[in-house]
Amino acid sequence: MDYYSSQISKLIEELSRLPGIGAKSAGRLAFHIINMPKEQVEQLAATLVDARNNVRYCKQCCTLTDKELCPICASEERDHKTIMVVDNSRYLAAYEKTGKYNGVYHVLHGAISPMLGIGPGDIRLKELMERLQGDVDEVIIATNSSLEGETTAMYISKLIKPTGIKVSRIASGVPVGGDLEYIDEVTLLRALEGRTAL
């Protein structure tokens, strides 16, 4: 038996499609949204549509931005000769919070996972290799320490080694299987400072 009206059930169903949101959390969010003032709901809906329509990939590093170049790639104060490779834009934000990394990034938007059918062509490796045609001294691989992250790191290392560009991997300290988004800034900073050559 369905306890809710079709509109509430549909809202719960749509919210539960979001990552990390189960049916109970979706229900709480749905009722919160329904009880919000109409203007706030309209603003939320407009913001979602606006973000979806205007956010795109930075033409250089592939992070999400609303401009052609993200603020990091557009900055002349950043070290454009050092590129940190991360799985997604959330991990870029995690490293930025340390305030200690002054290079630029490359966002893969995924990791190699044969079990899930994700191969090298499914992530942004082509764009990374194109960037390496420019003036780059070092690539820091900061993918997750999961099996997929390690597989991706080794694959990238093998691609880059023939170019003569220095390749390093963030140090451990980031727990195996740990999600970088939830690692504190000090641990991330130590992992970055203790990176090793591959």
What residue ranges belong to the model's regions?
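Cys/His-rich Zn2+-binding cysteine-cluster or related metal-binding knuckle/ribbon modules and their
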Residues: 2-8, 17, 30-83, 88-92
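Residue-level signal for pocket-adjacent positions within structured domains
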Residues: 28, 43, 56, 68, ...
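Conserved phosphate/pyrophosphate-binding and hydrolysis machinery centered on Walker-type P-loop NTPases
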Residues: 19, 38, 51, 63, ...
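Signal for well-folded cores of large energy- and translation-related assemblies
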Residues: 16, 34, 49, 62, ...
